[in-house]
Amino acid sequence: MTNISAFLVKKLRARTGVGIMDCKRALMCMKGDIDKSVDFLRKMGQIKAEKKQFLLTQNGSIFISFDHNLGVMLELSSETDFVSKHKDFLCLGEKILDYVLTHPMESIEFIRKHFEDLRTSLVMQVNENIVIRRIQTLNKKYITGYLHGRRIGVLVQTSSINNHLAKEIAMHIAASNPKYLRSDLVPKSIMEREYEIQLELAMQSKKSKPILEKIIKGRMIKFANEISLLGQNFIFDPHRKVSEVILKNNIDVISFVRYEVGEKYI
C-alpha cells in the first residue's frame, strides 16, 4: 500500500478544494501521483475543473518594459515575499531589464552568467537564494504591456496601434489567464485528457449515446474556449468574446506572454 504523506494530501487539497479524506483516497488509488489524482477526482465528479493547474510555489517579482517595437518580461525569484520587495532586489531586476533592452539576448544562461556577481552579492546581503527564473522578449511591432502588482505581467503583440484596447486586452489576459491564443492551438494531448474526463462524467448520467456525444461535444468546445484568449468573454464587455471585440475594432492579437510569480511552466 502506498504511504500517503500529510504534505501530499495538503498539496492536492490546495489544488482542488476537495476534502481531506477524498484527497487521501485519490492519492492512494493513484499511488501518490498529484496530476493523476486530480483527474481521478474530476472523473468522480468531485471537482468541475482544476483552477490551479499551474501551481504557484515561489515568491518573487515580475518586471516588464516595453515600447511599440520591443517588450521584455522577467521573473526574478526569491524565497520570501519580504525579499521580493527589497529595494536592492528590485534594483537588480531593473538592471537586468535595462541590459536586455539594449543588448540582443543570446540565452537566459548568458544573462544568468552576466549578472552572477550581482546576484551572489544580493544573496549574501539578504541571506536568501535569488534566481533569474525566466525572461521573454517580443521583438516586433505594436507591443503593449501590463503589470499587476508585480505578481502578474503581460506582453501583447497586436496587428496595429490601438493603445486603449491593447491595454484592456493585456489586463484581460492578466485576469483571465488564457493559456493559448486560439482554441485550435490547444495541444492534442490536453484535449484528449479533457475528453477522457468528460466522457467519464457524461457516462454517469446514463443517457443515450447520441445525447452523450452531444453533451461531450458541447463541453469540449466550452473547455477549449475557456483556456483560449479569443474564445473567452471579454472582461470589459462580458457579453462579447475577445474575438468579437477585436473584429469590431479591426485589430488582431498576434501573440501574448503572461507570467505569474511562481507558476509552473514548461
From Swiss-Prot:
Q: Where is the segment annotated Involved in Mg(2+) ion dislocation from EF-Tu? A: 80-83
According to its UniProt record, where is this protein located?
Cytoplasm
Name the CDD domains on file.
Answer: UBA_EF-Ts (cd14275)
The reply to whether Protein biosynthesis figures as a keyword in the UniProt entry is: yes
Work out whether the entry's keyword set contains Cytoplasm.
yes
Entry keyword set: Cytoplasm, Elongation factor, Protein biosynthesis
A Pfam family for this UniProt protein?
EF_TS
User: Which GO-annotated molecular functions does the record name?
Assistant: translation elongation factor activity
The chain's coiled-coil residues are none
Q: Which GO terms describe its cellular component?
A: cytoplasm
Q: Which PROSITE patterns match?
A: EF_TS_1, EF_TS_2
| InterPro entries in UniProt | EF-Ts_dimer_sf, Transl_elong_EFTs/EF1B, Transl_elong_EFTs/EF1B_dimer, Transl_elong_Ts_CS, UBA-like_sf
Principal localization reads: cytoplasm
Function text: Associates with the EF-Tu.GDP complex and induces the exchange of GDP to GTP. It remains bound to the aminoacyl-tRNA.EF-Tu.GTP complex up to the GTP hydrolysis stage on the ribosome.
Instruction: Give the family per the record.
Output: Belongs to the EF-Ts family.
Question: Can you name this protein?
Answer: Elongation factor Ts
State the species of origin. Answer: Buchnera aphidicola subsp. Baizongia pistaciae (strain Bp)
